[in-house]
């Protein structure tokens, strides 16, 4: 599948300017590497055009848009900060190949990476990146819309909690983080809400809220209306969510919640166990994000920046998952 075109980056086309060193780099690396697989099968052209259009004719980024987009993905695949991303790009040929950095080009520094991230936020482009990728995955048959899973998880704030001493020292508080309780423990931070397809466990939607937000109130934001059935835990069992599913003719796979005046029958409990066997697969996605993509704690302050972080982590997760699926299919 065709990869990024230099034409849309508002810089001279380097297609005929390859050096001997470029050709040598191109031959390095394994063809079944995750990054090589992503580069081979995913087309970033539309995403690059979307970002490049925001610069207009009068300005351009210090580095090619395609390079910076791929740097964002690398950061969220491997949990790299801006300084770490700059350092790793200087040292690792596999990273240079993935971002398509030519031998003549300088590695983007941490300031350039930070400014590019800020542009994505200011232009609202981060909201479209996951959708652009998923359109490609759907066309290739990897996202199956029939069954959708929904769930949420708590993520710690980068600030432990509001601190009078820290505020006096000039350190900014995290105004959008909030307190909640889980398992009788106090928690301060945010909540990540996602939906995924049940077959290949690819993320379809991803939304960040403050920690105290109730899962059921975010249901309509993460539940796609084009699915046939939705599975989730008891937190989503509300009249409003049931009405929304009936309106869109979606089969209700939400576990039934009992109450002090409504006792669950034996059939209800058996049905809940059946639904739980389906919906628990989404918990593996959160486990992967927290262990391998370092999402136990958010990196930024505020909902907007942390929404970008979750979106890019979802993009990176889907790309890594796609590479894994393709490798299994090739065996």
Report each predicted region and the residues it spans:
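Basic, short loop/linker segments at the boundary and entry of helix-turn-helix/winged-helix-like folds
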Residues: 28-73, 77
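Helix-centered, glycine/charged polyanion-binding patches within enzymatic domains
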Residues: 228-229, 234-308
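Charged, often Cys/His-bearing segments associated with DNA-binding zinc-finger transcription factors
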Residues: 1-45, 325-331
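C-terminal domain-tail junction helix/linker
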Residues: 309-313, 320, 324-331
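Secondary-structure capping and boundary motifs in well-ordered enzyme cores
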Residues: 43, 60-67, 105-108, 274, ...
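Phosphate-backbone recognition surface of nucleic-acid-processing proteins
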Residues: 97-114, 252, 260-270
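Polybasic low-complexity intrinsically disordered regions
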Residues: 83, 87-90, 100-104, 108-248
